[in-house]
Amino acid sequence: MYAIVKTGGKQYKVAEGDVIEVEKLAGAPGDAVQLAAVLLVDGDDLVTDAAKLAEVEVSGEIAAHTKGPKIRIHKFKNKTGYHKRQGHRQPLTQVKVTGISSGK
């Protein structure tokens, strides 16, 4: 059984036992988290009906908080000596999917 969930503006295909890396979620490692925005569930049959999907929940556990790769930004203006360097690392959360409730 798998589900497609939406969190942090992105969609993820998850199954029980998977570890996914999503945009930072509030909570400490070990805390339970519910991913309620379920877009599709495929088990015995494929479910895409919004009324049935409203009953489905994907539960998980926060495994760790990490950072993404370093992104370097360099701004430059010609003939003025203007250089601006900046870096960014996106905070991420690793979530271990513990279950997909069918809502039946």
UniProtKB/Swiss-Prot annotation:
Keywords: Ribonucleoprotein, Ribosomal protein, RNA-binding, rRNA-binding. GO terms for molecular function: rRNA binding; structural constituent of ribosome. One of its GO terms (biological process) is translation. Coiled coil: none annotated. It comes from the Bacteria. GO terms for cellular component: cytoplasm; ribonucleoprotein complex; ribosome. Pfam families: Ribosomal_L21p. Part of the 50S ribosomal subunit. Contacts protein L20. This protein binds to 23S rRNA in the presence of protein L20. Belongs to the bacterial ribosomal protein bL21 family. This is Large ribosomal subunit protein bL21.
